[in-house]
Swiss-Prot record:
Name of the featured protein: Proline--tRNA ligase
This protein's GO CC annotations: cytosol
Assembly and oligomerization: Homodimer.
Family matches, as CDD domains: ProRS-INS, ProRS_anticodon_short, ProRS_core_prok
Originating gene: proS
MF GO annotations: aminoacyl-tRNA deacylase activity; ATP binding; catalytic activity, acting on a protein; proline-tRNA ligase activity; transferase activity
Length: 569
């Protein structure tokens, strides 16, 4: 491939709209262009990277017995109505009508349509297990698309679905996919962690997220530094070893005026108490009712854990108006004493024996609150808070460590969540009808490309891992006007091409500095410079993009030398 003929519109400056480094560099280096908010065109360089990622995925899925198919993007509403997700999924679901006024959606995920396929085709236990996957575009109407390919409205995903006779079979399929995902991201040259996670809108029981570690990541990865322990979870799922801490001694409950005192910090200062003695209350709207979540003042409520305890379809923070209507006071003055709605309190709350909490009257708080004495007997105690860095690991007790990560894949044990709702059954050896047990497994292909850039870059541009780089080697003649340099550049270009390398030659009529900057910007792992030294001494200077090291090879050493270098990159 010749850069003089290659469609690679690079930019000299960072685009103003780009917020994260992958967005900036993929735009600058000519990989992507914005077509609409959250919608991008993948230019030739990006397409080469995406094809490599997809090829790695296909090889690992096929290795585990996966069979590739292609499901429709356009999905009929009836299937989503069967599972109840047509209304639950929310405004992120792209909905449309055809000319006959029939409802459809653009698939953000494909559980319904693949379950429909399997329920119509699979009848017997002899046809199971089954692993079916696809790689194609998905659609999600994000309210605020941002961060380039990280959160778009159109994106490429691989999703595989497993169909088994029972949970033992599902466990085998799940472990196969866990292994396959580990292989995929390892082969892509990425540093990552598999972490326990919450199932979210897809549902199911056990689930793991695969997180590429990067300082710019939106997600927080919580893990134990002891490799022998191996505990890791995302922040929403993470737990800590619970050790009760008794705070205060029982006292009489009293109502005290706290004018214009609303936050935990303000209450602590006004009443001269520690934050952990204060009880923080948060009102949520859950489906058709309300629930009050209570944690210590030095902790934060974990909305995902609350939702799982309530077992509702939709959980959202109550508005200030709803807080006043339900509890009769403003935020900052609400609390769990004397309320007639469900209360879920964190496990630590029970051990605060002399607590401060809102009095459900604006401008007043209660002191001397004892949960065992003053809360409703119906209060539910559960782990509903976010863990903090340094707290003990729930498995081994060592201090938990936080890191930032980018979710690039997730695997779920769906069990019979969809098969029962949609009537996907099979007949076992005894002729008895049983639900097919399912799992689903997704990889964000475009997100993986962006995450690779977030993890692998410097001030000069992208540093692609060799396995997913658009090209492995770029040949740069210093002067297009020097016939001998051009001749030797062409010779080495053809040599590498014939040896099976993915190589490009920069034959553009540009200054050497421009060529070198572009090579660094687009992130090709190895750059061969053909200059005066090449002509005079017959040697080729090879620069390693990742380390900036330079090595010198004779022509006859070049093929083996480059192969060895690429193995390390």
């Amino acid at each position: 491939m010749r850069l003089s003929q290659y469609f690679m519109p690079t930019l000299r400056e960072n685009p103003a709209e780009a917020e994260v480094i992958s967005h900036k560099l993929l735009l600058r280096a000519g990989f992507i262009r914005k077509s609409a908010s959250g919608v991008y065109t993948y230019l030739p360089l990006a397409q080469r990277v995406l094809k490599k990622i997809m090829q790695i995925i296909r090889e690992e899925m096929d290795r585990q017995g996966g069979q590739e198919l292609m499901l429709p993007i356009l999905q009929p509403a009836e299937l989503w109505l069967e599972t109840g997700r047509w209304h639950v999924y929310g405004p992120e679901l792209f909905k449309l009508k055809d000319r006959h006024n029939r409802d459809f959606c653009l698939g953000p995920t494909h559980e319904e349509i693949i379950t429909d396929l399997v329920r119509r085709e699979v009848r017997s236990y002899k046809e199971l297990p089954l692993l079916l996957y696809q790689i194609q575009n998905k659609y999600r109407d994000e309210k605020r698309p941002r961060f380039g390919l990280m959160r778009g409205r159109e994106f490429i995903m691989k999703d595989l679905y497993s169909f088994d006779r029972d949970e033992e079979g599902l466990e085998i399929s799940y472990r196969k996919m866990y292994e396959a995902y580990t292989n995929v991201f390892t082969r892509c040259g990425l540093k990552f962690r598999a972490v326990e996670a919450d199932a979210g809108a897809i549902g199911g029981s056990t689930t793991h997220e695969f997180m590429v570690l990067a300082n710019s990541g939106e997600a927080v990865v919580v893990y134990c530094p002891d490799d022998n322990c191996g505990y890791a979870a995302n922040l929403e799922k993470a737990e800590t070893k619970f050790t009760p801490e008794v705070i205060g001694t029982p006292a009489e409950i009293q109502k005290v005026a706290t004018p214009n005192v609303k936050t935990v910090d303000e209450v602590a200062e006004f009443l001269k108490v520690e934050k952990k003695q204060i009880l923080k209350s948060v009102l949520f709207k859950a489906d058709d009712g309300y629930v009050l979540a209570v944690v210590r003042g030095d902790r934060e409520v974990n909305e995902v854990k609350v939702k799982n305890q309530v077992d509702c379809l939709v959980l959202e923070l109550a508005s200030p108006q709803e807080v006043e209507e339900v509890l009769g006071a403003e935020y900052g003055s609400i609390g769990p004493v004397g309320v007639n709605i469900p209360v879920i309190a964190d496990l630590e709350v029970k051990h605060v024996l002399n607590a401060v909490t809102g009095a459900n009257e604006t401008g007043y708080h209660l002191t001397g609150v004892n949960p065992e004495r003053d809360f409703s007997p119906a209060v539910k105690y559960a782990d509903i808070r976010l863990v903090e860095e340094g707290e003990p690991c729930p498995k081994c007790g060592k201090a938990l460590v936080f890191a930032r990560g980018i979710e690039v894949g997730q695997i779920f044990k769906l069990k019979d969540k969809y098969s029962r709702k949609m009537g996907a059954f099979y007949l076992d050896e005894n002729g008895q009808q049983k639900p097919i047990i399912m799992g689903c497994y997704g990889i964000g292909v475009t997100r993986t490309m962006a995450a690779a850039v977030e993890q692998n870059h410097d001030e000069d541009g992208i540093i692609w891992p060799a396995a997913i780089a658009p090209f492995e080697v770029i040949v740069v003649p210093v002067s297009n006007k020097d016939e001998q340099q051009m001749k030797m550049a062409e010779e080495v270009y053809n040599l590498l091409l014939n040896a099976g390398f993915e190589v490009v030659i920069d034959d553009r009529d540009e200054r050497p500095g421009v060529k070198f900057k572009d090579a660094d910007l687009i992130g090709i792992p190895l750059r061969i410079t053909v200059g005066k030294r090449t002509v005079s001494e017959g040697v080729y200077e090879v620069k390693i993009r990742r380390t900036r090291e330079e090595k010198v090879f004779q022509k006859e050493e070049l093929v083996d030398g480059l192969r060895q270098l690429l193995k390390t990159l």
